[in-house]
A protein has these predicted regions:
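Beta/alpha (TIM)-barrel catalytic core signal, keyed to glycine-rich beta->alpha loops juxtaposed to Asp/Glu
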Residues: 111-215
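N-terminal binding-site loop/beta-alpha segment at the start of enzyme catalytic domains
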Residues: 1-70, 101, 127, 133
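Generic structural signal for well-ordered alpha-helices
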Residues: 31-32, 54, 58, 88-95, ...
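Active-site mouth loops of central-metabolism enzymes
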Residues: 13-25, 75-85, 114-117, 211-213
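Structural preference for beta-strand elements that scaffold enzyme active sites
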Residues: 5-9, 40-41, 69-75, 102-107, ...
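Short, acidic/polar
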Residues: 21-34, 82-99, 146-156
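Structural motif corresponding to the early beta-alpha repeats
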Residues: 48, 64-85, 109-110
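Active-site groove signature of glycoside hydrolases
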Residues: 95-115
Length: 215
């Protein structure tokens, strides 16, 4: 497994904006500070910021640093393919947009009961494993949003999955809708490394209400 330095990632679902466009100069400063601090893991998806996240990463990261300097995760999202034949061209377009020849991690995005059936019908997992054999993906994983029993089914049916991204924070730990703890326990059962998303719940866990700030 590629070495993720200091176990901390730069998520690109949200980036600084000027109006409707990514603030490129501020994002460059953030990327530089992140790498200078010894971190190296970046996470994006094609739909983030209406397709602007991947483009910003090419401008701010991949065109400015050698490939070995960073670890890049991208994702396959259900609404970008209808058939198996759609997947490979979409993947190749992601490589081009991001300005790289391979992804360190490629995740089947937002897996849950409904999405998973679509991915299975279109042989998305099989296509990803083929791309890994071709050297265009180093590690295949999933990002997951559903009940623990669904996660167990996926990991049973596709033991080749190498890593699982789950929502994990103290609010969602025992939330019956999110089931962070139970999902984490399933990952442990199957000996799968975990990548945490939403550790501060989109900033909500660090944005104090006014009455708390006054204390």
């Amino acid at each position: 497994m590629d070495r993720i330095k200091k176990n901390f990632g730069f998520g690109c679902m949200r980036l600084p904006m000027i109006g409707e466009e990514v603030d490129i100069e501020q994002t460059k400063q953030m990327v530089d500070a992140f790498l200078d601090a010894g971190f190296n893991y970046f996470d994006t998806a094609h739909g983030y910021i209406q397709g602007k996240s991947e483009k910003a990463l090419k401008t701010c990261l991949t065109s400015r640093y050698p490939r070995e300097k960073y670890i890049l995760t991208d994702k396959l999202t259900a609404n970008y393919f209808k058939t198996e034949a759609d997947i490979r061209p979409f993947f190749e377009s992601q490589l081009e947009i991001c300005g790289v020849e391979y992804f360190d991690f490629y995740l089947m995005h937002a897996q849950g009961l409904v999405n998973y059936d679509h991915f299975k019908e279109c042989r998305a997992y099989e296509t990803a494993f083929e791309l890994k054999k071709e050297g265009k993906i180093r590690h295949v994983g999933i990002s997951f949003h559903d009940r623990a029993e669904v996660l167990e089914r996926i990991l049973t049916e596709y033991p080749e999955i190498e890593v699982v991204q789950i929502q994990f924070n103290y609010i969602d730990y025992d939330d019956p809708a999110v089931q962070s703890r139970k999902c984490y326990e399933v990952c442990r059962k199957f000996n799968k490394p975990v990548i945490v998303m939403e550790p501060v719940k989109g900033g909500n866990l660090v944005n104090l209400p006014e009455n708390a700030k006054a204390v």
